[in-house]
């Protein structure tokens, strides 16, 4: 029997078409039976006649300990990548590099201090790779490359529904706004500050008209968007635009069971005062309207429709004041 098959050894177990991380629970030198416990709870008995490199093999030390950059893994296969992400996720390390690519795992909870002003300041003073993986490291590298390469930069954020693309976009804009305000050692002009605020604070209104509850995500973006920022030679944000595309128009008239129409309709009914409701002939709650209740879901405990209405109106009033 191979020397690495000792009690407590970390191995890969091939189960049908997939590899599972497992631990050697015990091994019998008499009949050669190997008892493995997969990380997901399954107990597997492997006979001596079944032992071969394709069935069970040792886990590389880099996979046992986990790495910040998966390009340095000693074994590159799907199971090793997923296992490394899971190891870091269990320690609230939701960011992992893959070379110059950043992989983010949505923790579905708040992680204290992960995006604090102190963290923003820390990443603004270091190059990519000098600190642990973080979305601020990507944003900082993008900002630095504007001046280092004298060329436009692009950050592509992609992932499945609920992966955290919308929140990641907000964090990128937050970091770039801070860098803009601190650039050149001089305070930004009033016009520059207004531009930054308009871009960053546009999120509530974009989400209200373009996001909806789906079975996978309670705040799912049902459209794509391209955000373009223009920087001055001094490093300040001078202007920008948001282009939306591929809006899921059919959601307005039909939703799948358990899903909702766009947030704006529910927030309007929840937050508008009596005069505004009467002006638009809105005399009932969302359950009374077919296009808002046909899916059987008009309310979700994780969504505050009244608060969203307040945020949208606050943004709209602030925008009117600026213009």
Model-derived regions: residue spans:
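Short coil-to-beta transition motif at edge beta-strands of beta-rich domains
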Residues: 2-14
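N-terminal switch/interaction subdomains of large nucleotide-dependent motors and GTPases
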Residues: 4-6, 21-31, 36-323
């Amino acid at each position: 029997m191979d020397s690495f098959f000792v009690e407590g050894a970390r191995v890969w177990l091939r189960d049908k078409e997939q590899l599972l991380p497992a631990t050697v629970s015990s091994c019998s030198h008499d009949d050669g039976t190997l008892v493995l416990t997969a990380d997901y709870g399954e107990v597997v008995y492997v006979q001596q006649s079944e032992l071969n490199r394709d069935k069970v093999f040792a886990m590389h030390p880099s996979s046992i300990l986990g790495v910040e950059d998966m390009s340095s893994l000693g074994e590159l296969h799907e199971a090793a990548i997923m296992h490394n992400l899971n190891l870091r996720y269990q320690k609230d390390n939701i960011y992992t590099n893959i070379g110059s690519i950043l992989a983010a795992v949505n923790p579905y909870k708040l992680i204290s201090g992960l995006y604090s002003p102190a963290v923003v300041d820390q990443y603004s003073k270091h190059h990519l790779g000098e600190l642990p993986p973080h979305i601020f490291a990507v944003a900082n590298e993008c900002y630095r490359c504007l001046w280092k390469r004298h060329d436009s930069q692009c950050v592509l954020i992609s992932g499945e529904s609920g992966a955290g693309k919308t929140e990641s976009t907000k964090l990128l804009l937050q970091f770039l706004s801070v860098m803009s305000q601190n650039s050149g050692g001089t305070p930004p002009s009033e016009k520059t500050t207004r531009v930054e605020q308009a871009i960053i604070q546009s999120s509530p209104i974009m989400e209200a008209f373009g996001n909806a509850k789906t079975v996978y995500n309670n705040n799912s973006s049902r459209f794509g968007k391209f955000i373009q920022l223009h920087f001055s030679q001094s490093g300040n944000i001078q202007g920008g635009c948001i282009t939306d595309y591929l809006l899921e128009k059919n959601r307005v008239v039909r939703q799948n069971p358990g899903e909702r129409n766009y947030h704006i309709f529910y927030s309007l009914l929840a937050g508008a005062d009596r005069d505004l409701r009467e002006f638009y002939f809105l005399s009932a709650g969302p359950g009374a309207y077919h296009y808002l209740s046909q899916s059987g879901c008009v309310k979700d405990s994780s969504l505050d429709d009244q608060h969203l209405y307040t945020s949208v109106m606050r943004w709209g009033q602030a925008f009117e004041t600026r213009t």
